Amino acid sequence: FPQYGETRVMTITGEATSFRLPAQTTTFLCPQNKAMSGWMRTKPCYEEEYKLDMPMSEPSAFGEGYTFPCLFRIGGDGWALVSETGTCGNYVGCHLSDYNPDTGYTIAFPMPGESNGIGQTSAGVALPYSTPWRTITLGETLKPLVETTIAYDVVEPMYQTTRQYKPGRYTWSWLLWQDGGTNYDDQVKFIDMSERMGYEYVL
């Protein structure tokens, strides 16, 4: 947004960005849970159960839309991954709305109460200002979506790293065994498994 005359700041309360996908599209989406619910009122914590290969018309489990990244199968024509990048402390983290046949999926701002009274559900920005990126990665297979670096390519680094970091494959005990799997013996198993599979990392 450019600066208009003497205007120095503005409040962004929503976005008109929307994504319309072909009718044959099915979804692989993580539903956004209600604010301040769940264990220690930490939701939405982006760890809900994905539903696989669902029609776009299927409402989200909690009526609050979906957490990024959002994966779509375009029938037999390929795949699309919709996400965001470049969100920092002066903008809100967004998600996708439920599907609407007229508008598709739209960018949804945080729910009231999501910040637990700290911060806002809108963005107050100094002008000039650029909003975060909304990205779409397409592929005939999942390979380009898994290997994309778009989240890093379109943003300016916020700091200089002390070493070269490289994307790679990994194993992760917590994903399978949750908190009970975060112990020494299980980590050794996952380190060994990463080595056997030729993976670069263990989380």
Question: What is each residue range found by the language model?
Answer:
Residues 1-153:
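N-terminal accessory beta-strand-rich subdomains and adjacent acidic, glycine-rich linkers
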Residues 126-201:
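An acidic-aromatic substrate-binding cleft motif
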